């Protein structure tokens, strides 16, 4: 199979020296890529700028991703060529529009007019005691994947914090239906550590638990191969 994996996190630039990012390390994406390579699949890894990545491999191509826009461009290029996509990347929900001092905001009668402005400085001044940063919502990358390739096997990820398994499963199933995914790997930040990572791989009628990143990766590889083989079997009948 030809596998597309997204991994790590995006960074949305405020100016040339500042940005909004997240704590994603890309460790699970790295392990996933290694497991797919071990199973003799071709892998394209879209990795955040600081994400962990595997060692060089003849069947591996690594492309570094900076922000949501660069991820969207890469997805449009690669998704139509792939058999499966494992979308683990922690994608920024918001991107900066404009940053200014609090006094300017307070004096502006039409606050929405600030949304049409852009910062032109390479480094925004840090002289002011308070700054206001306007953000706008970014497009949901996972929602575009099946539109780009209706036949792709799509495995998405849903991370929540300190919720019950029932809530985790329901939220994952909501994402499954909304994005037309084949599976969602649901996990809770409070159950993730250096040695432990509880994940629930969920489909419309299936739930399987894994307790480490390695086991999660093995499960995803196995299920991807299973769906691919079933699809090809039907296509070749």
Show which residues each predicted segment covers:
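A cross-family phosphate/adenosyl-ligand binding-site feature
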Residues: 1-237
């Amino acid at each position: 199979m030809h596998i597309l994996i997204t991994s790590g996190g995006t960074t949305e630039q405020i100016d040339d020296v500042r940005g909004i990012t997240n704590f994603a390390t890309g460790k699970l994406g790295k392990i996933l890529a290694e497991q797919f390579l071990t199973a003799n699949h071709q892998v394209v890894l879209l990795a955040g700028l600081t994400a962990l990545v595997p060692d060089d491999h003849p069947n591996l191509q690594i492309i570094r991703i900076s922000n949501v826009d660069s991820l969207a461009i890469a997805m449009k290029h690669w998704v139509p060529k792939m058999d499966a996509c494992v979308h683990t990347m922690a994608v920024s929900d918001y991107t900066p529009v404009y940053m200014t001092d609090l006094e300017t905001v307070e004096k502006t009668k039409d606050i929405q007019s600030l949304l049409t402005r852009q910062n032109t400085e390479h480094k925004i001044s840090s002289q002011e005691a308070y700054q206001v940063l306007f953000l706008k919502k970014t497009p949901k990358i996972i929602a575009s994947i099946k539109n780009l390739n209706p036949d792709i096997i799509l495995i998405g990820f849903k991370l929540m914090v300190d919720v019950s398994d029932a809530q985790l499963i329901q939220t994952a199933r909501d994402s499954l239906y909304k994005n037309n995914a084949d599976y969602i790997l649901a996990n809770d930040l409070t159950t993730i550590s250096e040695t432990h990572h509880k994940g629930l791989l969920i489909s419309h009628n299936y739930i399987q638990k894994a307790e480490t990143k390695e086991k999660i990766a093995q499960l995803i590889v196995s299920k991807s191969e299973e769906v691919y083989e079933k699809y090809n079997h039907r296509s070749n009948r």
